[in-house]
């Protein structure tokens, strides 16, 4: 009798756990659909709590993936000519300049792979007093999905590594060993969010 009761309780607990996992999976899928659909604002967050909306990204669902298109707000940037190149930059305690990825970008993401979106958000920073820009001072924002968008934390990259074409142009270059940890609070913009358009 006790053995049968124990078995029944175990089966019920197992069923409840499976149901919970299924619910979590469904919630994650819904979150992924919300994050990868529609128009979102690109917002840079400063270390002092202020925020600056610098553009939008439009996601278009395409089966299990989404295509995206970024439109920067040129009024938030100043044109700079640095190291024989033209950049769109944001001025402040440091100068943050957007660096377009110089090789083909399919602009497709999935809930599990946001690398091509991250590669459309590459930057280089410099001090206002510095002459020119050192491409070794590159930044990529490592994105994590939220319920309705993304949050990204800066990681250090050396943009000189893509001065020549990577061996595999079909794979986003700045992943894994090509990224380096940054101590929180060391950069002017400490995070980026991609959130529902206001």
Where in the sequence are the language-model features?
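Boundary at the C-terminal end of the N-terminal hydrophobic targeting segment
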Residues: 19-33
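Edge beta-strand at a domain terminus
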Residues: 137-138, 147-198
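Bacterial N-terminal signal peptides
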Residues: 8-22
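Short, cysteine-centered beta-strand-loop-beta hairpins and adjacent loop/turn segments enriched
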Residues: 47-51, 77-81, 106, 158-169
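Positively charged n-region of N-terminal signal peptides that target proteins for export
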Residues: 1-4
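Tryptophan-anchored aromatic micro-motifs
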Residues: 32-55, 69-74, 95, 146-155
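A short, structured loop/turn motif at beta-sheet edges
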Residues: 32-34, 60-67, 88-95, 142-151, ...
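Predominantly extracellular/secreted and cell-surface proteins with exposed
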Residues: 64-133
């Amino acid at each position: 009798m006790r053995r049968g009761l124990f078995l029944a309780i175990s089966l019920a607990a197992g069923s409840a756990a499976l149901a919970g996992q299924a619910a979590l999976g469904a919630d994650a899928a819904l979150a992924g659909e919300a994050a990868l659909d529609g128009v979102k604002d690109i917002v840079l967050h400063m270390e002092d709590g202020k925020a600056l909306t610098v553009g939008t990204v439009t996601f278009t669902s395409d089966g299990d993936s989404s295509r995206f298109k970024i439109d920067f707000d040129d009024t938030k940037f100043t044109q700079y000519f640095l190291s024989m190149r033209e950049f769109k930059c944001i001025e402040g305690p440091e100068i943050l300049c957007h660096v377009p990825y110089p090789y083909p970008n399919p602009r497709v993401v999935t809930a599990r792979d946001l690398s091509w979106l991250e590669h459309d958000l590459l930057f280089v920073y410099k001090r206002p007093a510095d002459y020119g820009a050192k491409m070794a001072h590159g930044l990529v924002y490592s994105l994590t999905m939220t319920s309705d968008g993304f949050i990204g934390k800066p990681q250090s990259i050396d943009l000189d590594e893509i001065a020549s074409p990577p061996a595999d142009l079909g794979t986003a270059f700045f992943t894994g060993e090509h990224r380096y940890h940054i101590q929180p609070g060391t950069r002017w913009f400490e995070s980026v969010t991609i959130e529902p358009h206001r």
